[in-house]
């Protein structure tokens, strides 16, 4: 297990309860120091959390759109999984203009996103009613390819720091799968990476050395898995329904977790900086 010293893994409240709806999701750290996340005050909004933990509305999405996962495009814009409109939206970080970057009528409801260092990215796509799911590849020109069908409820998704592996969890089935990624973004060699006996899974993020942090929805914890799928830490939160996680702060070692039962975020320190934060330092 990771060393549990007094400075690590102790959750604290970032903002007051219920500033966000129960649909709070998609936290994503930006190189400008802000964290962007969905459903501030009302459904269909995106909120912004400043480095000093002030939170405000960033933008209202178009009518009929509600965001879920957010990731940062290599050019700095926000990429938002619009699960109601079956779209991937691209929002200019400077002028706030919104465009549909990708759309496919075969998408159930795009849920979470994960970028590859080469510039393409993936979307999880669950069908909650049928307890099934898909994985989509989205290229830099917005073209979409369904890579996997008939999985369980695909939810959390992440690419390893070296770009060699894709991790996808199935919330209802409580399984995390690992795939190999080729240079074109195709995936193969589906392998069971980790399985939990109870409760659900939601968003996932890697730190810079490849540890995978997984939110345990309903259990109120975040687990940390090493690159072999072994649990090396479990962090107990104050809330019970963590939906997603990102890493930020001055050194990238502050984990921010969205809590749907509290409508807010909790944070705790980790031993290694997040991979997205680390990537921004190289740009």
What is the predicted role of each segment?
Residues 1-21, 53, 59, 190-191, ...:
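A short helix->beta-strand "capping" segment at the edge of beta-propeller domains
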Residues 1-10, 40, 125, 134:
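Blade/loop signatures of beta-propeller domains
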Residues 243-283:
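Blade-level signature of beta-propeller repeat domains, shared across WD40, Kelch, NHL, RCC1
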Residues 40-41, 83, 126-128, 171, ...:
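Short loop/turn segments immediately following the C-termini of beta-strands
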Residues 49-54, 92-96, 138-142, 180-185, ...:
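Short loop/turn segments that connect beta-strands within beta-propeller blades
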Residues 45-47, 87-89, 134-136, 175-177, ...:
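A short loop-to-beta-strand structural motif that recurs across blades of beta-propeller domains
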Residues 18-32, 62-82, 87, 104-134, ...:
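Beta-rich, blade/repeat-based domains predominating
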Residues 181-244:
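Glycine/small-residue-rich hydrophobic helix-like segments
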């Amino acid at each position: 297990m990771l060393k549990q010293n007094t400075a690590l893994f102790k959750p604290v409240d970032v903002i007051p309860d219920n500033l966000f709806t129960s649909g709070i999701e998609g936290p994503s750290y930006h190189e400008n120091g802000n964290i962007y996340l969905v459903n501030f005050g009302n459904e269909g909004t995106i909120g912004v959390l400043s480095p000093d933990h002030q939170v405000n509305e960033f933008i209202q999405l178009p009518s009929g759109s509600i965001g879920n996962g957010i990731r940062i495009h290599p050019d700095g814009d926000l990429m938002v999984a619009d699960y109601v409109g079956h779209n991937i939206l691209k929002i200019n970080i400077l002028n706030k203009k919104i465009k549909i970057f990708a759309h496919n009528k075969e998408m159930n409801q795009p849920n979470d996103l994960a970028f590859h260092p080469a510039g393409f990215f993936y979307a999880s796509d669950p069908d909650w009613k049928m307890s099934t799911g898909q994985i989509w590849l989205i290229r830099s020109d917005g073209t979409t390819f369904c890579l996997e069908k008939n999985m369980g409820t695909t939810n959390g998704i992440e690419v390893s720091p070296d770009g060699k592996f894709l991790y996808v969890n199935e919330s209802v089935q409580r399984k995390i799968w690992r795939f190999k990624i080729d240079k074109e973004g195709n995936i193969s060699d589906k392998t069971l990476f980790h399985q939990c006996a109870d409760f659900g899974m939601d968003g996932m993020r890697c730190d810079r050395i490849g540890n995978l942090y997984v939110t345990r929805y309903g259990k109120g914890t975040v687990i940390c898995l090493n690159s072999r799928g072994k649990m090396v830490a479990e962090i107990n939160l104050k809330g019970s329904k963590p939906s997603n996680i990102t890493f930020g702060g001055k050194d990238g070692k502050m984990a921010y977790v969205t809590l749907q039962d509290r409508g807010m975020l909790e944070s705790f320190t980790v031993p290694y900086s997040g991979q997205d934060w680390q990537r921004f330092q190289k740009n």
